[in-house]
Amino acid sequence: MASTNDLKNGLVLKLDGGQLWSVVEFQHVKPGKGPAFVRTKLKNVLSGKVVDKTFNAGVKVDTATIDRRDMQFSYMDGEYFVFMDMDTYDQLMVDRKAVGDAANFLIEGFTASVAQHEGEVLYVELPAAVELTIQHTDPGVQGDRSTGGTKPATLETGYEIGVPLFITTGEKIKVDTRSGDYLGRVNS
């Protein structure tokens, strides 16, 4: 339990029948007339839905402890992603729903942050940018500007992104894991 006066960004609250909500923004408001209150913007940890919620100042709210651990992606086992804890060497099977869009950028050996609450995996978080190899892309043709200077390329994970015309098959590039956009070449 914590008071609404103790709210901070990133704190996870248990509200609405046990649902987990992360504090995105908060503001303590002290109007000239009436009691003080706290205006918050909360994001549902599982669905990503964002809502505005107002609490009276000093009210007690349930907090949840989220255990984030760095784990290494080992391999796929059917529909499950198998991660290994680098400290204990324990393996953890994570379903595709919890991995989400991170599946587009995971290759064996990558380290990801796995968030758990009471033993249940909530989500998998990758670093903001990862380095991946272009598995296939067509050669860029001089003067071909119908696509705005980009062409499709397939990464080693099978995910397809748009890259500049000068990128060739086999090159290593940086990719933004949040948007899936090309960030640049990796200097060898």
From Swiss-Prot:
Pathway: Protein biosynthesis; polypeptide chain elongation. Keywords: Cytoplasm, Elongation factor, Protein biosynthesis. It is found in: Cytoplasm. Its main location: cytoplasm. It comes from Streptomyces griseus subsp. griseus (strain JCM 4626 / CBS 651.72 / NBRC 13350 / KCC S-0626 / ISP 5235). This is Elongation factor P. Involved in peptide bond synthesis. Stimulates efficient translation and peptide-bond synthesis on native or reconstituted 70S ribosomes in vitro. Probably functions indirectly by altering the affinity of the ribosome for aminoacyl-tRNA, thus increasing their reactivity as acceptors for peptidyl transferase. Gene3D superfamilies: 2.30.30.30, Nucleic acid-binding proteins. InterPro entries: Elong-fact-P_C, NA-bd_OB-fold, Rib_uL2_dom2, Transl_elong_fac_P/YeiP, Transl_elong_KOW-like, Transl_elong_P/YeiP_cen, Transl_elong_P/YeiP_CS, Transl_elongation_fac_P. PROSITE patterns: EFP (PS01275). The keyword Endoplasmic reticulum does not apply. One of its GO terms (cellular component) is cytoplasm.
